[in-house]
Amino acid sequence: MIDAGTDRGDIAITVRDAYKRYGDFVALDHVDFVVPTGSLTALLGPSGSGKSTLLRTIAGLDQPDTGTVTIYGRDVTRVPPQRRGIGFVFQHYAAFKHLTVRDNVAYGLKVRKRPKAEIKAKVDNLLEVVGLSGFQGRYPNQLAGGQRQRMALARALAVDPQVLLLDEPFGALDAKVREDLRAWLRRLHDEVHVTTVLVTHDQAEALDVADRIAVLNQGRIEQIGSPTEVYDAPTNAFVMSFLGAVSTLNGTLVRPHDIRVGRTPEMAVAAEDGTAESTGVARAIVDRVVKLGFEVRVELTSAATGGPFTAQITRGDAEALALREGDTVYVRATRVPPITAGATTVPALSRDGADEATLTSA
């Protein structure tokens, strides 16, 4: 599938009608997918959604039962991985334990019998780019997890790949290291401009790093777009729910931070400019107030249905409301994403063929 607005003359990767089955399990269900040149595209989805199978199909590690893969206009569907011009980084990178960081990064260049001076200059530059200049003489077991993944990326980039494929490269690292590496990866991409496809199940990682996000589910692409597009204008309930916490207000999905909380119905409908907005207001009971740095999570129960839901408000608003367990409050959705059930934002490539509102958790 190709999202509207993508110029087909500037496409690095095209996957067309890819179908892959393992026994009774359909991993890819006639997927169409394109990656613009120089972009960083994230494949996001739950386990079993097909994201890793799609990446491995691009890499040549898996063969589609039907369909084609082209890289910069060259059909590589039956071309082995080592001849596709790709760099690949796995979650658990297999470094050469007996080689130093420098020699690990240089390995691919030595195999290609590049001149020694070229290898030295290339490795020096890459170690500087990935922030490992001071670690070039160390061995992999002397590096922290984040440093090993930086080494892995430098090694993948050393051979000047046309495409860089990353299969959950930070998935085995702790949360703080992952957060730091996300910012680093974005800076690295902006510097080297290699067309990159990143597989992740981490919504924050995809939203933070990617130029475009493809959300997969059950072997299909549900939506492709910029982080802003998929978050603010999700195609369907699955995309919205997968990209963050949701509650249901008046039968529509809303984000917790789009729920206004007030002590009175009037406070719940008051707009920022002081005017009143006519919309449904729901009464709820406060179950718990959890401080999360700048924001505060308010866990609530609908007075109408007894269903639990969550609102996310600023710390300042929470202090002004002075919420406590058991308090009665009034809530209202300030924004509702325009979800259209069954709609799609990825048209296929041409081929044949006034009452009290009720709230529940989603």
From Swiss-Prot:
Pfam families: ABC_tran (PF00005), TOBE_3 (PF12857). One of its GO terms (cellular component) is ATP-binding cassette (ABC) transporter complex. Residues 13-243 form the ABC transporter domain. Its main location: membrane. Keywords: ATP-binding, Cell membrane, Membrane, Nucleotide-binding, Sulfate transport, Translocase, Transport. Its EC number is 7.3.2.3. The keyword Cell membrane applies. GO terms for molecular function: ABC-type sulfate transporter activity; ABC-type thiosulfate transporter activity; ATP binding; ATP hydrolysis activity. It is an enzyme of class 7 (translocase). It is found in: Cell membrane. InterPro entries: AAA+_ATPase, ABC_SmlMolc_Importer, ABC_transporter-like_ATP-bd, ABC_transporter-like_CS, Mo/tungstate-bd_C_term_dom, P-loop_NTPase, Sulph_transpt1, TOBE-like. It catalyses: sulfate(out) + ATP + H2O = sulfate(in) + ADP + phosphate + H(+); thiosulfate(out) + ATP + H2O = thiosulfate(in) + ADP + phosphate + H(+). ATP binds at G45, P46, S47, G48, S49, G50, K51, S52. Part of the ABC transporter complex CysAWTP involved in sulfate/thiosulfate import. Responsible for energy coupling to the transport system. PANTHER family: SPERMIDINE/PUTRESCINE IMPORT ATP-BINDING PROTEIN POTA (PTHR42781), SPERMIDINE_PUTRESCINE IMPORT ATP-BINDING PROTEIN POTA (PTHR42781:SF4). This is Sulfate/thiosulfate import ATP-binding protein CysA. The gene is cysA.
